[in-house]
């Protein structure tokens, strides 16, 4: 099975209780857990290079999460590597490593690599989890992400999110501006362009399976097309010609339908499209602007923003358009709601005005309408912060962040991520300006 990582053995070692308390990643801010990712044993030079690179990726994944503090290899005392021996735990405790990762890489006759790892609790001197993976060389990075995911899940109790992709809009800094749909790993690696930049493109969206995307393309000023692109084959097809559309559709959880906003006759409304028949069904009524629809994880409800009461606020309705309820009640204008994959929170952009002008904010609120009076929480603010999207485990939010032009530097737009708690804000490196991020589910 080329180009697919598969697990030979789902669990190599029995899981035992351990001294470390499970990290609560929703409430408060905990000190990062110190972890040593030891050099991976290798049976030849090719495996050694691969192992060295994998250790860097695993360490970086854990560090970026904000929940782990990888210890520098320069401080390691024990020199043994691999999974065939029991570590000298006292040596690892001496450098304050609560967790230890040992691993090995072997090149198989098939040309693939067998990668094994064990996560140890150095305090109780117990194995926590271990696995064997078999991968082709070109997927070594995904194998490293898979290992980091397993470590993250074991310690936090939540699924990891490292083996994922981000699709976004890349914009050149030179004039004329060229916008292209781009795809990269969650950490900014393996960036590649999916469109050629000949037309204006906006708001890429993943399908549930992460092997397809939607995006909006302005073929001409009057002709706006929605494309569906297969990421495995590269083939594109036109979903429809929607002159009044402003954002790409969002897929339903079952992948059979999608929702979008379309402007007609002075009003903008939410429509659902059946992807098989291409038939549209209007979900909102009345006057005003209704935009940015997003399904709940179970597909039974839709959140969107509407100015039906004068100022853009957030509303929830059933997926058939019934039982509309307002869920935002704070001052300012709300936009771009995004439902967490866990179903518990909705992320949003909020624009407020003060003496210094407009301020953009990213916030979260509970998805239950009756709980929402004064329950929203702002997690980051700036000159321009917008387009929040969720990690597949619902614990990290990615968004676009912009700065204005000045006499010293031109304006710029970049992609950032931040924890649900509002801590650990970090930039996701891209080769050019970037906006409109969308996070895939965990890859198969």
UniProtKB/Swiss-Prot annotation:
Signal sequence bounds: 1-19
GO biological processes: cell division; protein import
Subcellular localization(s) per the UniProt record: Periplasm
GO cellular component: periplasmic space
Pfam families: PD40 (PF07676), TolB_N (PF04052)
Gene3D superfamilies xref list: TolB, C-terminal domain (2.120.10.30), TolB, N-terminal domain (3.40.50.10070)
Protein origin, superkingdom: Bacteria
Transmembrane segments: none
Keywords: Cell cycle, Cell division, Periplasm, Signal
Primary location class: periplasm
Self-association and partners: The Tol-Pal system is composed of five core proteins: the inner membrane proteins TolA, TolQ and TolR, the periplasmic protein TolB and the outer membrane protein Pal. They form a network linking the inner and outer membranes and the peptidoglycan layer.
Protein's job: Part of the Tol-Pal system, which plays a role in outer membrane invagination during cell division and is important for maintaining outer membrane integrity.
Similarity comment text for this entry: Belongs to the TolB family.
Name assigned to this protein: Tol-Pal system protein TolB
Native species: Rickettsia rickettsii (strain Iowa)
Gene responsible for this protein: tolB
């Amino acid at each position: 099975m080329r180009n697919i990582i598969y697990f030979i053995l789902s669990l190599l070692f029995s899981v035992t209780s351990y001294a470390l308390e499970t990290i609560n990643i929703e409430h408060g801010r905990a000190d990062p857990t110190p972890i040593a990712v030891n050099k991976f044993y290798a049976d030849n030079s090719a495996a050694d290079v691969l192992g060295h690179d994998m250790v860097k990726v695993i360490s970086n994944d854990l560090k970026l999460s904000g929940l782990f503090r990888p210890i520098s290899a320069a401080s390691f005392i024990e020199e043994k590597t691999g999974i065939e021996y029991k570590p000298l735990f006292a040596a690892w405790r001496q450098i304050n490593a609560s967790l230890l990762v040992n691993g090995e890489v072997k090149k198989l006759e098939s040309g693939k690599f067998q990668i094994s790892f064990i996560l140890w609790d150095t305090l109780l001197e117990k194995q926590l989890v271990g696995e064997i993976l078999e991968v082709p060389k070109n997927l070594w990075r995904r194998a490293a992400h898979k290992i980091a995911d397993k470590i993250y899940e074991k310690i936090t109790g939540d699924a990891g999110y490292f083996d994922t992709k981000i699709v976004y809009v890349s914009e050149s800094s030179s004039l004329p501006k060229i916008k292209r749909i781009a795809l990269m790993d969650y950490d900014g690696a393996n960036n590649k362009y999916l469109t050629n930049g000949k037309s204006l493109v906006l708001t890429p969206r993943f399908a549930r399976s992460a092997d397809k995307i939607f995006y909006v393309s302005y073929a001409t000023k009057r002709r706006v097309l929605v494309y569906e692109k297969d990421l495995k084959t590269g083939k594109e097809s036109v979903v429809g010609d929607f002159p009044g559309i402003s954002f790409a559709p969002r897929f339903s959880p079952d992948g059979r339908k999608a929702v979008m906003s379309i402007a007609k006759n002075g009003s903008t409304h939410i429509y659902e499209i059946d992807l098989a028949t291409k038939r549209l069904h209007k979900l909102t009524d009345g006057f005003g602007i209704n935009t940015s629809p997003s399904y709940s994880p179970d597909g039974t409800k839709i959140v969107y923003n509407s100015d039906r009461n004068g100022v853009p606020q957030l509303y929830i309705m059933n997926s058939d358009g019934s039982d509309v309820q307002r869920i935002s009640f704070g001052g300012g204008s709300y936009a771009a709601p995004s439902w967490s994959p866990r179903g518990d929170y909705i992320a949003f952009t909020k624009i407020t005005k003060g003496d210094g002008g407009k301020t953009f904010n990213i916030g979260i609120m509970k998805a239950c309408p009756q709980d929402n009076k004064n329950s929203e929480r702002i997690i980051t603010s700036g000159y321009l912060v917008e387009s929040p999207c969720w990690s597949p485990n619902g614990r990290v939010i990615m968004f676009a962040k912009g700065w204005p032009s000045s006499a010293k530097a031109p304006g710029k737009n970049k992609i950032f991520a931040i924890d649900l708690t509002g801590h650990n804000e970090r930039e996701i490196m891209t080769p050019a300006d970037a906006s409109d991020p969308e996070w895939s589910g965990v890859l198969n």
